[in-house]
């Protein structure tokens, strides 16, 4: 019954968004929309010239065009009360950067004609939320593990194929650290926060039914040669309860297996000077990596 109510609520939200006008379901400054539409046009031109271009190829093209974008943490959480689909291309963090590149590529692949911003926004909604439209903080896909599993039609986790193994590392960070999140704080006294915390706790339990996998940090150098440009690299956390600490896009050039990412240290999107193996081995908070390949 609870699931039916959620489905009906989501459907009502979507229908109300359509009837109220295309812009009602997202928040995005005009400058960000302009960047997105420019990228969609440029990626569409690439696809038109090379119809067989893979999703990974379009992702890397998008990543290169977003080089230098400022790193800003917490861009989705500026309003702890009203959960909205927020889309920014003038600022980003690590997961939003990869999400944006993937969604730009998927949107261009999906449409024959050049897609517009609204079509891109619907794609972002479908990958960021469990229900194709935002209606609560607890409905956002917070854990990268869930994000990967829910995109199984367009992404393939190849961690085990590369020699990875099961990682006994249950996910629980958000439910055990609710005060670290504005939307979950004081859940005992705020019904909205209590509901979000309940949904997140249920999600954690569901995710933990399937074991995590990873390539240990001391094994990464041995499999680097099998990583391809455009693969999504998930840096697995060594912190109790947390699944993924950082996300990037693999970039192989001149035999060097590097990566493109929104770097907090650099304060912007960069091609990191380190290889993937060098990066993961230099950080004590990382246990290893997952490798996810766009289909």
Q: Model-found features: residue ranges?
A:
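C-terminal soluble interaction/assembly domains
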Residues: 220, 224-295
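Acidic/His-rich structured neighborhood in mature extracellular/periplasmic domains
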Residues: 69-208, 252, 261-264
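Cationic-aromatic interfacial patches
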Residues: 24-99, 106
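Sec/Tat signal peptide C-region and signal peptidase I cleavage site
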Residues: 18-22
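Mature, folded catalytic cores of secreted/periplasmic enzymes
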Residues: 38-48, 57, 112, 214-218, ...
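Mixed-charge, Lys/Arg-rich low-complexity intrinsically disordered regions
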Residues: 196-226
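Bacterial N-terminal signal peptides that target proteins for export
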Residues: 1-8
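Bacterial N-terminal signal peptides
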Residues: 8-17
């Amino acid at each position: 019954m609870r699931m039916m109510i959620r489905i009906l609520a989501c459907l009502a939200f979507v229908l109300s968004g359509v009837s109220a006008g295309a812009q009602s379901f997202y928040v995005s400054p005009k400058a960000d929309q302009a960047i997105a539409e420019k990228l969609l046009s440029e990626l569409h031109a690439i696809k038109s010239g090379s119809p067989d271009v893979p999703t990974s190829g379009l992702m890397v093209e998008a990543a290169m065009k977003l080089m230098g974008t400022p790193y800003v943490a917490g861009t989705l959480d500026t309003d702890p009360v009203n959960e909205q689909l927020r889309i920014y291309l003038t600022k980003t963090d690590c997961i939003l950067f990869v999400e944006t590149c993937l969604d730009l590529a998927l949107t261009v692949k999906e449409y024959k004609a050049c897609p517009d911003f609204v079509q891109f926004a619907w794609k972002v909604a479908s990958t960021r939320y469990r229900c194709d439209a935002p209606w609560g903080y607890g409905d956002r896909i917070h854990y990268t593990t869930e994000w990967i599993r829910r995109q199984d039609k367009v992404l393939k986790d190849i961690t085990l194929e590369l020699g990875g193994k099961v990682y006994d590392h249950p996910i629980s960070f958000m439910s055990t650290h609710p005060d670290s999140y504005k939307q979950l704080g004081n859940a005992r006294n705020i019904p909205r926060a209590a509901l979000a915390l309940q949904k997140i706790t249920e999600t954690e339990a569901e995710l933990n039914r399937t074991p995590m996998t990873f390539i240990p940090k001391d094994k990464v150098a041995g499999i680097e040669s099998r990583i391809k440009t455009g693969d999504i690299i998930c840096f697995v956390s060594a912190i109790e309860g947390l699944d993924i600490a950082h996300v990037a896009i693999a970039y192989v050039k001149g035999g060097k297996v590097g990566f493109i990412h929104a770097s907090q240290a650099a304060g912007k999107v960069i091609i990191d000077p380190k290889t993937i193996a060098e990066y993961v081995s230099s950080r004590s908070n990382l246990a290893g990596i997952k490798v996810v390949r766009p289909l």
